[in-house]
């Protein structure tokens, strides 16, 4: 079979100065490839399944799933280092990882990082970060397994739905008989359960929902993480069922965790406490942007903030103190006249 490879750079690859939840989510990695299929410029697209939206166009179905590679997330340290530097943040690109890292390394700061794998490793080795959290599969595919310092167990760091699986997408109505031998049944069933779990909870780039399915002894065990954005409460849980009922299993676990989260949150008394305790707004001066001149009180309120509004005068060292769960709002003011805020015009 003769194959012509059409390489493409997506919008998600081009916009690197903002986190994915601020620029439109995972759909930014597939739009250009979808357009190429619809316009007849290509007949197949290959994606990392974890980067695909939960909803795919009816005319562009997922045709096959590859055999799953190593599903785990890993810790990568700078070259020549064997311990974490507590003064520098851990870099990772997903809210799912940030949330779970807070359990594993509660005293470490976590900071977003974008770019392809080589770009991220260069930033790490230049001293910007104490470590990175990445997918093991991506490092192994590029022959960089020697950079891995620690593997996270799938129970302490639940992977993203579809992690370690490549998905083949095509055009509805075309003959893809040749793909039958490529589609891996176990990966297909596990991914179906994982994506059903996330889809029911409306999860994606803007919510740290996670799911991992594993088939053993003829049974599919699905482990999931549900996060309630309004309350900040989250739960992990699992459910076992028949692999042939993968979609139902995913939806069922999602419903259970969602209901349990509501009950536990209510029983904890946090709901009542939130009603009684009004929120506070703190005005914190960032000075000339030098973290060394930041006040202790400013650092304290920043580390406990739920929402942080900042402009371009603030230094990156100050931003690393913001908790991973906080919502960031960049008003975009420039540091020279005329001052400008997005939306003014």
Positions of PLM-derived features:
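Class I S-adenosyl-L-methionine
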Residues: 275-289, 298-345
């Amino acid at each position: 079979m003769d194959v012509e490879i059409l390489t493409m750079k997506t919008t998600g690859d081009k916009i690197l100065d903002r986190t994915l939840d601020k620029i439109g989510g995972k759909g930014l990695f597939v739009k250009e490839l979808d357009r190429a299929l619809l316009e007849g410029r290509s007949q197949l697209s290959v994606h990392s399944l974890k980067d695909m939206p939960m909803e795919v166009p009816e005319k562009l179905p997922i045709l096959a799933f590859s055999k799953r590679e190593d599903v785990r997330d890993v810790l990568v340290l700078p070259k020549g280092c064997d311990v974490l530097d507590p003064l520098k943040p851990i870099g990772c690109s997903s809210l799912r990882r940030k949330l779970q890292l807070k359990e594993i390394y509660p005293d470490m700061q976590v900071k977003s990082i974008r770019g392809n794998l080589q770009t991220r490793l260069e930033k790490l080795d230049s001293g910007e970060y104490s470590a990175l959290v990445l997918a093991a599969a991506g490092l192994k595919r590029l022959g960089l397994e020697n950079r891995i310092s620690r593997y996270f167990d799938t129970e302490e760091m639940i992977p993203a739905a579809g992690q370690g699986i490549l998905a083949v997408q095509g055009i509805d109505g075309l003959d893809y008989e040749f793909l039958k031998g490529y589609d891996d049944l176990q990966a297909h069933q596990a991914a179906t359960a994982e994506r059903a779990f996330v889809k029911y909870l409306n999860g994606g780039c803007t919510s740290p929902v996670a799911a991992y399915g594993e088939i053993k002894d003829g049974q599919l065990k699905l482990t999931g993480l549900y996060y309630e954005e309004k309350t900040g409460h989250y739960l992990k849980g699992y459910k076992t069922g028949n692999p042939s009922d993968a979609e139902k299993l995913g939806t069922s676990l999602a419903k259970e965790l969602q209901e349990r989260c509501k009950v536990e949150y209510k029983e904890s008394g946090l709901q009542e406490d939130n009603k009684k305790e009004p929120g506070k707004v703190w005005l914190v001066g960032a000075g000339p942007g030098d973290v060394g001149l930041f006040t202790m009180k400013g650092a304290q309120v920043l580390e406990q903030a739920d929402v942080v509004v900042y402009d371009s005068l603030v230094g990156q060292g100050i931003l690393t103190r913001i908790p991973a769960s906080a919502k960031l709002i960049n008003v975009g003011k420039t540091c020279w006249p005329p001052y400008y805020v997005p939306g003014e015009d």
